[in-house]
Amino acid sequence: MTNIRKTHPLMKIVNNAFIDLPAPSNISSWWNFGSLLGICLILQILTGLFLAMHYTSDTTTAFSSVTHICRDVNYGWIIRYMHANGASMFFICLFMHVGRGLYYGSYTFLETWNVGVILLFATMATAFMGYVLPWGQMSFWGATVITNLLSAIPYIGTNLVEWIWGGFSVDKATLTRFFAFHFILPFIIAALAMVHLLFLHETGSNNPTGITSDTDKIPFHPYYTIKDILGALLLILALMLLVLFAPDLLGDPDNYTPANPLNTPPHIKPEWYFLFAYAILRSIPNKLGGVLALVLSILILVLVPTLHTSKQRSMMFRPISQCIFWILVADLLTLTWIGGQPVEHPYTIIGQLASIMYFLLILVLMPVASTIENNLLKW
């Protein structure tokens, strides 16, 4: 008798993706983040669903409804903090996942990589709109500042901003539509994640060496299912430590003040995972230039495959490129720190230098280092 797992139309898809999938025998823990992102997404959709049952997307009651969730709803506080801190875990996993792709040359799977970049943009859009929903001071002013950036687009800018706002300022219409988009986008992300996986399974996984692993494959289950479970346990441990011991560690105290259009907070800043991009935006004195730099800071990932000049795929055996990669990581941490600081000396100049370094490292130094390493191979 044939196994139902291998014959049933639905089970067959699951089997070929998660059970009998041939996987390289040497993929390290850096390959865990894909499954962790899946877990984060499921967690966010579930906690978000329960929050949406009690939330009201009206400017007069939004802030109160979030307070009501935390005070009166059974376990509402834990659902709310799991959702807020779950977003942080999501972005930690995202950054690790992208970093892994950059380090080991996974970007040579073009379709998988490009769908991944779209996923990153979609997740960032979702997180931004979610941050607006509690309707605190930072929610309101964050929404005002970031949507206002679109007014820098020549000719259509102002009309575009007012169209997004649904009026002449961030108000009821804006909050309602942001809630609608925040609800639908995670499902679009889930669909895109399936496309991401579909493209990945056309080629099979990369591995730390960057060398084809067709001669040495092992089944995904039980080897990598158990490895993913360990990763998931560590993820949940980290999340629950954050939720139960320091739920407001990564949040902004200003968001515990209801939104007030007449009172601007002294330092408007986004959640920590957007600070690097915010620092790049602020480091350019021109509005349109800043917006372009902001978009390019993420869109630059699309160019990475075309900038790959090395004869080797992975950075495992490329010490110069490794060095540049870790300088890039340090640069991004510097930008994250600067994004959270006020616009004054010496932060402005540090931010400008770090922004220049960011683009320089990716566009110039990495391809140059690869070419040098190619020449060193001849020695």
Swiss-Prot record:
Gene3D superfamilies with a match to the protein in the record: Cytochrome Bc1 Complex, Chain C (1.20.810.10)
| Keywords, sorted A to Z | Electron transport, Heme, Iron, Membrane, Metal-binding, Mitochondrion, Mitochondrion inner membrane, Respiratory chain, Transmembrane, Transmembrane helix, Transport, Ubiquinone
Q: Transmembrane: present as a keyword of the record? A: yes
Write down a Pfam family by its short name: Cytochrom_B_C
Q: Where does a ubiquinone bind?
A: H201
Q: Which GO terms describe its molecular function?
A: metal ion binding; ubiquinol-cytochrome-c reductase activity
Binding, heme b b566: H97, H196
How does the annotation summarize its subunit structure?
A: The cytochrome bc1 complex contains 11 subunits: 3 respiratory subunits (MT-CYB, CYC1 and UQCRFS1), 2 core proteins (UQCRC1 and UQCRC2) and 6 low-molecular weight proteins (UQCRH/QCR6, UQCRB/QCR7, UQCRQ/QCR8, UQCR10/QCR9, UQCR11/QCR10 and a cleavage product of UQCRFS1). This cytochrome bc1 complex then forms a dimer.
Please tell me what else the database record remarks about this protein.
Heme 1 (or BL or b562) is low-potential and absorbs at about 562 nm, and heme 2 (or BH or b566) is high-potential and absorbs at about 566 nm.
Q: What does this protein do?
A: Component of the ubiquinol-cytochrome c reductase complex (complex III or cytochrome b-c1 complex) that is part of the mitochondrial respiratory chain. The b-c1 complex mediates electron transfer from ubiquinol to cytochrome c. Contributes to the generation of a proton gradient across the mitochondrial membrane that is then used for ATP synthesis.
Entry's family note: Belongs to the cytochrome b family.
Record protein name field: Cytochrome b
Organism listed in the record = Oryx dammah (Scimitar-horned oryx)
Native organism taxonomy: Eukaryota, Metazoa, Chordata, Craniata, Vertebrata
